Amino acid sequence: MTHTTEIKAHILRDYRLAGWQERIVGRWHYRQLVADDDWRNGWISFDTVTYNPDDGAVYCGLNSIDGDLLYRFEPATERFIGLNSRRWTDPFDVKIHRTLLHNRSDRCFYFGTSLLHDIDQQREAPGGKLVRYDLTADRYDVLGVPVPMLYIQSIAADFARGKIYGFTYPAEALFEFDLAGRRGEVLAYTGNAMFFSQPHNPVVDGAGWLWGTYAETRAWDEKLSDVPIRLFKYHPEGRRFVWFDHGLPRKADRRQLLPDPPAPAGAASALAETRHRDDFGFCDSMAYDGKRYIYAGTVAGALCRIDTQTDAVEKMANVMATGRFPGLTVAEDGTLYGAGGMKGHTQVIRYRPGDERIDSFFDLVDPAINDGPARIHELAVDRDHQLYLAENDNHQRSSYLWTARLP
């Protein structure tokens, strides 16, 4: 399959952006970006999206230099409603990166803030905030700064145990935050001076284990091992870590469960343009099916699954032709949806457990504007299986939110 039956752009801001290749990339400092009116106000990304079954709306966390970070999108009216995050942001809170979590018990959202500033401003920046948003009362509560000076790349929650876990950035560590006591603690470092792991997002399984990836240290050696990026899991009871020697599969691995789905014509791997030029099984996304499997997407574009009962990892297929696979979500009926891609070659995939194939959809273009997402960073799905695609890092214009219905 190659086409969606319907894709539509939903435009929050619509700035045309100029000079990325000619003036900015590899040259500017962050302060210059902030000082430029068009880039400060127009260079937004939809970094995270979450469907709320209570009100049928989609909540959108942005990358926005001006600190305007949280919006509600109402599908029925196709309206964006700003949630006035600038009530609490400071100049260094410029992203809700991953993830925007909805707690069904208290009906609040939980998220962390991330950064764009350079290293010379780290002493001015207080660190990433953990925030709770009560949408019924329209009230924000800054729960704390789990790791001062560092910012929050992603979070996962075990609301039953009153825990939020997160990965920090740019120095990579795993923290645990106790919601009742509002206390944060660093549990482990996950990256190091030798290697950048950037696990993107962790998940908590049904038994309370937190899953993520880490980079080996090898301070005693000059050479990486064959598996420098590996899986770990952590349980708060007994504060137990299991550091595995295996990681996620690579695109070149030949053993896989399913055939590769069709790919867009002319879409070659763009891995060399990412921070991860080599395919070491870097984790780009994780989604738990609520039962047994954690699905994971790799930066190189492979889909795999982790069996939480045996800790085994299986490669399913190569699904993103260009690489980058940051979007994964599981619908209420168990259908897995994924999204990713680079350089305009973006894709959506669908897998129904038990099927012998993965469906692939590309040519994601809204005919009304003759344009499509440059990249997709995350996706959400509603009860009618409409998809919400979060575009990010478009350097020609403001990024948009996109809706898609698959045949």
Say what each PLM segment does:
Residues 12-39, 84-92, 142-150, 188-194, ...:
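Surface-exposed loop and turn segments in beta-propeller and other repeat-based domains
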Residues 52-55, 102-106, 158-161, 204-207, ...:
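Residue-level detector of Asp-centered blade-edge/turn motifs that repeat once per structural unit
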Residues 57-61, 108-110, 163-166, 209-212, ...:
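Conserved beta-propeller blade signature
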Residues 373-407:
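Blade-level signature of beta-propeller repeat domains, shared across WD40, Kelch, NHL, RCC1
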Residues 74-78, 134-138, 178-182, 235-239, ...:
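Short loop/turn segments that connect beta-strands within beta-propeller blades
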Residues 34-66:
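Beta-strand-rich domains and repeat architectures in extracellular enzymes and scaffolds
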Residues 43-50, 92-101, 149-156, 194-203, ...:
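Repeated scaffold domains used in trafficking and secretory/extracellular systems
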